[in-house]
Amino acid sequence: MNLHEYQAKQLFAEFGLPVPEGYACDTPQEAFEAAGRITTEKKVVKCQVHAGGRGKAGGVELHDTKDGVKEFAQKWLGKNLVTYQTDANGQPVTKILVEEASNIANELYLGAVVDRATRKIVFMASTEGGVEIEKVAEETPELIHKAAIDPLVGPQAYQGRELAFKLGLEGDQIKQFVKIFMGLGTMFSQYDLALLEINPLVITGEGNLLCLDGKINIDSNALYRQPKLREMHDPSQEDEREAHAAQWELNYVALDGNVGCMVNGAGLAMGTMDIVNLHGGKPANFLDVGGGATKERVAEAFKIILSDDNVKAVLVNIFGGIVRCDMIAEGIIGAVKEVGVTVPVVVRLEGTNADLGREVLANSDVDIIAAESLTDAAQKVVAAAEAK
């Protein structure tokens, strides 16, 4: 689950990190009043969406009047912001962040992720702030400095000092950086984060450090024990189909192809997408129905897949391990009837009672294309999609 910039900064402030004075606003009038509370001559106004590239898309502006801030809010609130990280429809803007402008002398980068290879939280710092860290890692990896946090002992001050020295910080800046580093390390573990970034972490004209931007991603598997963070969830930033799927405990990701995929198991789902690609097709989605492929969940999965007008055929690929294939076949038949599926449906069953499952499909009054193998299924569904 992603957080907005203003939410990330709220958490930063909670852990004693320096952030600009700012206010998240729902209306143009609120933005106008917020600008009046900020004492700096210039104010920064930012659209709050779960996507990067806001500045280049016109979603971040500098204003020196309250009326200018209000006009910006009137322009964007209720509209969609399209950036290089969004689709053509963009992301809806429901909040505007109004904050004090900062006197920037230098820009740094500071971020942290879970390194699954070492099973540690790894902090990354660089003097190349304000640009995509992926680009820095590709072109000048020597400019990225790392510190691995042992989960048994947590972040240590000496690690923060080492990073500060490598960034060329001096004097009181080192103490400030260590405080930021320690706060972020504690926050990462306490809130079950998967990723956090401060890009840029700036050095102001007065020589102080300031968290000018914030990006936080929370491990969705841990949200059950993070009620405070759950309340920060903004469903408007999610694909409607993905949000609907989550309600049924279906793992769905929308793609831009024309072959709908319904599979049980994430690994099998990825393999299914690969083989569809291999045979010239383009998957329209990733959808894992999980181990409990009941009639109800299969029906909802069909509804979600078919809500995409680009879908011309559906491939159902089920491995019967926990559940029996004959039961799954009956669920598929019932779901196809209930939903009123009008596109070709190719079904491949393997595992427990697979032969019986195929027999159930063959004896049904529903027009379903049976496949003997995964390759056969991919070839048939690609051909069916091309024929539509």
UniProtKB/Swiss-Prot annotation:
Q: Which reaction does it catalyse?
A: succinate + ATP + CoA = succinyl-CoA + ADP + phosphate; GTP + succinate + CoA = succinyl-CoA + GDP + phosphate
Q: Output the Pfam families linked to this UniProt entry.
A: ATP-grasp_2, Ligase_CoA
Q: In which pathway does it act?
A: Carbohydrate metabolism; tricarboxylic acid cycle; succinate from succinyl-CoA (ligase route): step 1/1
Key words of the record? ATP-binding, Ligase, Magnesium, Metal-binding, Nucleotide-binding, Tricarboxylic acid cycle
**GTP-binding as UniProt keyword:** no
Binding residues annotated for substrate, in chain numbering: 264, 321-323
UniProt domain ATP-grasp: residue ranges:
9-244
Gene3D superfamilies referenced in this protein's UniProt entry, alphabetically? ATP-grasp fold, A domain, ATP-grasp fold, B domain, Succinyl-CoA synthetase domains
One GO cellular component, as annotated: succinate-CoA ligase complex
The family database entries (InterPro entries) matched by this protein are listed as: ATP-grasp, ATP-grasp_succ-CoA_synth-type, ATP_grasp_subdomain_1, Succ-CoA_synthase_bsu_CS, SUCC_ACL_C, Succ_CoA_ligase-like_bsu, Succinyl-CoA_synth-like
Free-text remark on how the cofactor is bound: Binds 1 Mg(2+) ion per subunit.
A GO biological process this protein is involved in? succinyl-CoA metabolic process
EC id = 6.2.1.5
Domain of life of the native organism? Bacteria
Name what cofactor the protein needs.
Mg(2+)
- The reply to whether Cell division figures as a keyword in the UniProt entry is no
Where on this chain does Mg(2+) bind?
A: 199, 213
What family does the database annotate? Belongs to the succinate/malate CoA ligase beta subunit family.
This protein's assembly is summarised as: Heterotetramer of two alpha and two beta subunits.
Tell me, what does this protein do in biology?
Answer: Succinyl-CoA synthetase functions in the citric acid cycle (TCA), coupling the hydrolysis of succinyl-CoA to the synthesis of either ATP or GTP and thus represents the only step of substrate-level phosphorylation in the TCA. The beta subunit provides nucleotide specificity of the enzyme and binds the substrate succinate, while the binding sites for coenzyme A and phosphate are found in the alpha subunit.
**What's the protein called, per UniProt?**
Succinate--CoA ligase [ADP-forming] subunit beta
- The scientific name of the source species is Vibrio campbellii (strain ATCC BAA-1116)
Instruction: Give the encoding gene's name.
Output: sucC
